[in-house]
């Protein structure tokens, strides 16, 4: 079907728009923006910071202009456990440390995927998906758990934040461009049957990725001294720890005991779903989600909070979110009322159409 807009139709659109109501809301939207003009103040009456189940929290950490929310959330759950166990409120872990290893591991798994798919054309959907993920920042719980399990953790002072960890676009773009160029080289070598040269080049490329990342964010420490004061001001010192030793010594956690629950009503409940394209560590924990009804997910989260344990969660945070207040609410913006349209869809419909 091909429909060409006519001048008569445009004239009708103008006529339909020409009323006082549209002029009033247009002035408000143009002056304040669509979201401000449609903000629903009624949400403030029911969104407060008083909860029936409270878990003691520490100071908020700030991912700044980076896609590391998944990593911050995982490390926040770990530092909550540390603070609770060792009475050290506001103890923080370095996000920069695990961010470094994420870049190296992602490059490694990217090169493997490119080599394995070298027999497919560049416009193959699988190959294009790999190319799109090159240099990416975003992630899931299993990705952070894989990094912690393999590389451990360090306190913030052992590897502090830097400009390029707070603002990752520059490094991510540089890594993506390099990895895509490397992909062309590796594909050509595989197609020519030069197996030994493939492995040689792969190692060379990984060394270059390491160099780029180290230049941008610094090299991660091999060892460090753990030094902190607990809530009673008592000094604690544990010298010459490796990051893995630190994690194994101070945390009693088995990541395999945890599962990510999701609510995707456009897919069958009671099934385990995976995102193999987003796995970041070869031999790590694969990304999986157990799809359950929303009531089950809610009940599980409440039980975990009642047990005194923080809950990692991920959501489409840019939808119905106000940065100034921190509100997340499906009734936050009355954009349908502003535009006089009906965009309501069920959650299943939103997911199926790419809206969710």
What does each model-identified segment do?
Residues 130-134, 168, 172, 177-179, ...:
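Active-site-adjacent substructure of cysteine-protease-like catalytic cores
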Residues 72, 76, 80-81, 147, ...:
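Generic, well-ordered alpha-helical scaffold segments in large soluble proteins
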Residues 61, 140, 293, 355:
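Short, glycine/acidic-rich beta->alpha junctions
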Residues 2-58:
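N-terminal regions that are enriched for targeting/export leaders
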């Amino acid at each position: 079907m091909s429909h060409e807009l006519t001048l008569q139709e445009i004239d009708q659109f103008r006529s339909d728009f020409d009323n006082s109501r549209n002029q009033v809301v247009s002035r408000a939207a143009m002056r304040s923006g669509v979201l401000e003009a449609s903000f629903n103040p009624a949400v403030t009456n029911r969104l407060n910071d008083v909860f029936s189940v409270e878990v003691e929290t520490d100071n908020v950490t700030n991912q700044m202009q980076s896609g590391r929310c998944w990593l911050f959330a995982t490390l926040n759950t770990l530092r909550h456990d540390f603070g609770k166990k060792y009475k050290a409120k506001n103890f923080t872990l370095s996000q920069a440390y695990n961010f470094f290893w994420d870049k190296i591991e992602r490059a490694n798994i990217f090169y493997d995927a490119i080599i394995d798919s070298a027999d497919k054309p560049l416009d193959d959907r699988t190959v294009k998906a790999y190319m799109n993920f090159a240099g990416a920042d975003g992630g899931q719980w299993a990705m952070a758990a894989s990094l912690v399990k393999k590389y451990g953790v360090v306190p913030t002072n052992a590897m502090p934040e830097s400009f390029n960890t707070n603002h990752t676009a520059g490094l991510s773009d540089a890594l993506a461009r390099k990895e895509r160029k490397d992909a062309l080289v590796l594909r050509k070598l595989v197609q020519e049957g030069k197996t030994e040269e493939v492995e040689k080049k792969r190692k060379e490329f990984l060394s270059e990725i390491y160099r780029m990342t180290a230049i941008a964010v610094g090299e991660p420490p091999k060892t460090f001294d753990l030094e902190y004061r607990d809530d009673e001001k008592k000094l604690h010192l544990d010298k010459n720890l490796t990051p893995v030793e630190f994690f194994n010594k101070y945390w009693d956690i088995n990541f395999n005991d945890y599962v990510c629950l999701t609510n995707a009503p456009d897919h069958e409940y009671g099934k385990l779903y995976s995102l193999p394209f987003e796995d970041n560590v070869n031999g790590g924990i694969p990304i999986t989600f157990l799809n359950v009804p929303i009531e089950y997910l809610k009940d599980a989260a409440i039980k975990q909070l009642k047990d005194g344990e923080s809950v990692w969660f991920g959501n489409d945070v840019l939808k119905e979110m106000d940065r100034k207040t921190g509100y997340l609410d499906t009734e936050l913006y009355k954009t349908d009322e502003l535009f006089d349209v009906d965009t309501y869809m069920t959650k299943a419909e939103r997911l199926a159409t790419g809206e969710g």
